[in-house]
Amino acid sequence: NIQDISFDEENPVFVTDKNRHTFDKVVIACGAFSKKLTDKLDEKIPLDTERGYHVHFKDCDHLLSRPVIFSNRGSGITPMEQGLRVVGTVEFGGLDNPLSKSRIKNLIDNAKYMLGDLPDHEDEWLGFRPTLPDFLPVMGPSKNHKNVFYCFGHHHLGWTLGPISGKIVSGMIAKENTNLNLDPYSSARFN
């Protein structure tokens, strides 16, 4: 795990719990955990953590044949190998706050309202989604350190947008012409 970032002249140094690693250039792409490193670089990027919840009901996948969204209750249910996954609540809650039992209860209540009697749920989960106030990711060089690049803040679309964002940032590092105006994604927009 990366504990700190420092510099050997202009070269970034990642300090882990076991060693120090010096690089010519680095990309901070740690999702919701990126803020812990950007704060150490004196960049005030207002990254927050959007926490999305779900619960699983085991051996209930036979109740539905396809995903269903109940917009009037703000919930969705998807049959999966593990059973039924119930989703539909999100909050800004940071990385350290405990899971909200009231949000879990809301998901369970919605599932039972929609499908009737269900067995006890199998597990509870929440995921950390890196979110910025303008809903745009941060991509590009640090405003303070030319050998540090950023690629984070994709909200719940990280799995979708991560690969193309990674390609764009790697092109920037290689000084390739991207033919894109990347100013809206700069970390400087917050300073």
What do these predicted ranges mean?
Residues K143-N191:
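C-terminal lid/capping helical subdomain adjacent to the catalytic/cofactor pocket in oxidative enzymes
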Residues N1:
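Conserved acidic residues
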Residues F14-D17, G153:
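Short beta-strand segments that buttress and anchor functional surface loops
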Residues D4-F7, N11, R20-H21, K25-K146:
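Active-site substrate-recognition segment that forms the wall
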